[in-house]
């Protein structure tokens, strides 16, 4: 997630065009023409031995002759010269380079050359980039684009050209327009980090085909989406499309899971993409999901209603006060309701009056105005009057307004006026609703990600025992474990299983059944038959010895006939579970080539297709994330909300999914887990049949996960000066209530020292940002006192690293009544050790000159203390490398 060199790429002060030309069909000509036409106000240096000047600009014969080192170079020559030219640019000290084309055979050499010279690369096979706020058009596109607040990042030149052409027709602006190409060096995660902090960018749109590093993408996207809406269109949903794009894109539901986990929103096609661009460019952030619809015809309003219903949207309910004001203002034949049909004879004045009344109310969160071509209210005239009314209304900034001027030719000018006025406008009622629901879903995603997770009850795990069992099985050469072998592993994580016995033949099966009691179930054991149902390999409700013997022999006979070469490892014998009113579910964990382990929930079946029959999540899961997965399964009808007799216990199933997640996170030896069926009966969840694929694992356990899990290994018990022992551990999302209680025990003076302002209270969003952190980017250690089953926070220290992992900003806060126990120092020592081990170079912070305790502590810990009395601050800097040496 490095930001090194991005400033030189996205805000260059000078640009060299290598291979500049005066021949109109050459890349060097097109690049020079676009750079000069774009209004770039820095030096543009054409490099070519063939021309003395290019488009009136003095040319230089080679890179060595350049009068100074350019920030950015663009290679427009034959691809065979790429490596030699890049080497020359590196020796010159150039910081960034755009490579327009390069064969795959060059990629490794180009990457190595760039690394050697500390140079950043965009591309190869990149269309280039446009930065309208800098007057920069370093691309092949002749299309000029306006300045705007939307940034677009694309992995496809074709899609980039399409969006540029579409945006030009609608006079839509961008802050940045970046075509990544093959992402040999600079990738989407680094650009997300940059754009998240860019003041000219208020929203981001991504077109993606593949990812080089899923974890970096999820981390960067999650961080950026907390402040700016990000929409994604992802191609390659089908295997055929993946082959066409020549990508290993992974399971499409895994993309959905990652996008949702990061707080982004996915659009499904180019039609939605265009609507999304319009929405992100002009729409205000939503306050809620209640929609009010105004129309001058029933049919367009009905189309909007149908679309809203299909998206599970929510209509606003008007208050009686608002209804009465509308009755007084509108003709008597207008029925006051939502949608509000002003009828086809409605004038522009009726629209404006209605808008004024509605904007004064607080009955809705977004207002959709539909206009069908009408002689009573001409499209352009009504648009102009509506724009003026919105511009001068004192409450217009509190409402998200969407306009839908139907028709093509007659409404074209009206839509142009809306775009100029910064109001989102759409061609159809359905497209308008789709755009609205995009923002509703984005808001819901962000709200869900900030909810405080519930604490699971009776959550147990014995990682050491599970590891031992897995290692023993691997040492014995096992690659797959059956139900009876998996049982102790699941039980180590608190999951219920049915007691299971192995019978080698029908006689032994009868003997076991007699011992455990009837009724029983028999299940075939064969590594060669993937689905037992193919040979009726599961027999249930066997109530006598004769039934058991006959069933066992029948299973063996069917295998010999249908699968004569199959190996038979006997039978599993289980007591029959109570299936009365129970529901059968399936939980599967599989490894995705892009996102690593995935947790899938569905109802199963012989020909199980997770893309169609399951909902998917990325581990690790907490109770909130698990509950969202269950609810998503119910809403999408992948699982039923109830069995014949009782509703599904959502909380209980969520807890089981958390247990599965913990098992997968802790045990990298697990390649695949299949619990099928999982019997849900009231609050009881029992794994009846389980298979587990395993393999030796070496390396970093966390690296295989798309989201970094809670690092248990950093927990530490510490003894304070008064002899009390407390636990130092990483902060958790579940800590929000305890953190709020901790802050209430800190004096106003100490809070002022910490936050440099008077803090009356912290909102839920503030506390969520403090507790729901990305351990890849931020670390917060809390000192907790454990009393019985409760925890009490005594102190907090925190470090937030920059994307380059060089500097981190730190802070520390201790409960005011616990000073003098050495707690602050021990927390700081813990943080210093962590940041140093994490590869950071410097730890920085600021405090106030009169915070003598913090200043003294910083000096003792080796910080450089810079007292700046004029600024009223004290700068604190610790060189972590020097401290380690000392």
Language-model regions, residue ranges each:
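Catalytic-core regions of core metabolic enzymes
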Residues: 1-689, 697
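Long, contiguous binding/interaction regions
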Residues: 697-886
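Short beta-strand element of the conserved SAM-dependent methyltransferase core
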Residues: 522, 573, 692, 783, ...
């Amino acid at each position: 997630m490095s930001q090194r060199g991005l400033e030189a790429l996205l805000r260059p002060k000078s640009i060299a065009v290598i291979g500049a030309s005066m021949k109109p069909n050459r890349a060097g000509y097109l690049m020079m023409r676009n750079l000069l036409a774009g209004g770039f106000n820095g030096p543009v240096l054409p490099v070519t031995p063939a021309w003395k000047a290019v488009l009136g600009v003095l040319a230089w014969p080679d890179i060595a002759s350049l009068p100074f080192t350019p920030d950015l170079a663009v290679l427009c020559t034959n691809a065979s010269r790429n490596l030699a030219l890049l080497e020359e640019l590196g020796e010159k000290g150039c910081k960034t380079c755009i490579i327009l084309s390069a064969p795959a055979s060059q990629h490794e050499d180009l990457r190595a050359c760039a690394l050697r010279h500390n140079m950043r690369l965009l591309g190869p096979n990149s269309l280039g980039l446009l930065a309208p706020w800098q007057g920069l058009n370093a691309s092949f596109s002749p299309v000029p684009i306006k300045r705007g607040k939307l940034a677009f990042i694309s992995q496809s030149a074709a899609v980039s050209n399409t969006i540029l052409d579409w945006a030009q027709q609608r006079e839509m602006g961008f802050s940045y327009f970046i075509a990544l190409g093959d992402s040999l060096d600079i990738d989407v995660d680094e650009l997300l980090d940059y754009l998240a902090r860019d003041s000219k960018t208020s929203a981001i749109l991504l077109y993606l085909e593949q990812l080089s590093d899923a974890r970096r993408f999820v981390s960067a996207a999650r961080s950026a989406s907390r402040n700016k809406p990000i929409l994604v269109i992802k191609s390659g949903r089908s295997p055929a499309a993946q082959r066409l794009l020549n990508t290993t894109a992974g399971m499409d539901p895994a993309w959905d899971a990652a996008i949702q986990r990061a707080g982004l929103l996915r659009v499904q096609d180019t039609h939605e993409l265009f609507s999304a661009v319009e929405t992100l460019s002009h729409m205000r952030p939503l306050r809620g999901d209640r929609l009010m619809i105004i129309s001058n015809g029933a049919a367009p309003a009905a189309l909007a209603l149908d679309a809203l219903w299909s998206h599970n949207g929510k209509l606003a309910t008007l208050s009686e006060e608002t209804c009465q004001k509308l009755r007084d203002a509108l003709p008597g034949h207008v029925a006051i309701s939502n949608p509000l049909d002003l009828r086809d004879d409605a004038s522009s004045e009726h629209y404006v009056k209605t808008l004024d009344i509605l904007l004064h109310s607080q009955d809705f969160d977004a207002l959709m105005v539909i206009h069908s071509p009408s002689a009573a209210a001409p499209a352009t005239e009504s648009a102009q009057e509506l724009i003026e009314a919105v511009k001068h209304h004192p409450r217009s900034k509190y409402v998200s307004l969407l306009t839908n001027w139907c028709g093509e030719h007659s409404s074209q000018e009206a839509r142009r006026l809306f775009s100029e006025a910064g109001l989102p406008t759409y061609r159809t009622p359905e497209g308008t609703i789709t755009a609205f629901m995009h923002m509703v879903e984005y808001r819901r995603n962000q709200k869900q990600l900030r909810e405080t997770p519930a604490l699971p009850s009776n959550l147990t795990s014995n990682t050491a025992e599970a590891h031992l069992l897995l290692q023993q099985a691997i040492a014995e050469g096992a690659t797959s474990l059956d139900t009876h072998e998996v049982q102790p592993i699941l039980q180590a994580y608190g999951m219920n299983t049915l007691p299971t016995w192995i019978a080698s033949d029908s006689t032994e099966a009868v003997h076991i059944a007699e011992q455990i009691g009837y009724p029983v179930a028999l299940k075939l054991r064969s590594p060669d038959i993937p689905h037992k149902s193919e040979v009726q390999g599961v027999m249930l409700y066997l109530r006598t010895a004769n039934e058991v013997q006959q069933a066992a022999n029948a299973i063996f006979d069917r295998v010999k006939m249908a699968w004569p070469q199959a190996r038979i490892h006997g039978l599993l014998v289980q007591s029959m579970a109570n299936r009365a009113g129970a529901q059968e579910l399936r939980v599967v964990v599989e490894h995705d080539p892009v996102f690593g382990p995935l947790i899938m929930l569905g109802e199963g079946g012989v020909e199980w297709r997770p893309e169609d029959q399951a909902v998917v999540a990325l581990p690790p899961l907490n109770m909130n994330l698990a509950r969202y997965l269950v609810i998503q399964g119910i809403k999408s009808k992948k699982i039923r909300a109830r069995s014949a007799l009782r509703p599904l216990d959502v909380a209980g199933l969520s807890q089981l999914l958390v247990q599965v997640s913990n098992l997968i996170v802790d045990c990298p030896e697990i390649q695949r887990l299949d619990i099928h069926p999982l019997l849900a009966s009231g609050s009881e969840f029992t794994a009846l049949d389980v298979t587990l694929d395993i393999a030796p694992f070496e390396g970093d356990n966390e690296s295989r996960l798309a989201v970094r899990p809670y690092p248990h290994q950093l927990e530490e018990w510490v003894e304070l000066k008064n002899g009390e022992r407390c636990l130092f551990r990483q902060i958790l999302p579940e800590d929000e209530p305890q953190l709020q209680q901790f802050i209430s025990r800190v004096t106003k003076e100490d809070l002022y020292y910490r936050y440099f302002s008077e803090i009356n209270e912290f909102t839920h969003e503030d506390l969520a940002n403090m507790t729901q952190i990305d351990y890849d980017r931020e670390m917060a250690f809390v000192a907790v006192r454990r009393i019985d089953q409760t925890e009490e926070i005594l102190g907090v220290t925190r470090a937030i690293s920059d994307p380059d992992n060089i500097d981190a900003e730190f802070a520390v806060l201790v409960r005011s009544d616990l000073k003098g126990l050495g707690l602050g120092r021990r927390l700081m020592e813990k943080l210093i050790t962590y940041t140093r081990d994490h590869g950071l170079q410097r730890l920085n912070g600021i405090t106030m000159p009169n915070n003598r305790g913090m200043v003294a502590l910083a000096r003792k810990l080796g910080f450089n203390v810079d007292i700046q009395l004029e600024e009223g601050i004290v700068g604190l800097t610790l060189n972590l490398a020097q401290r380690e040496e000392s």
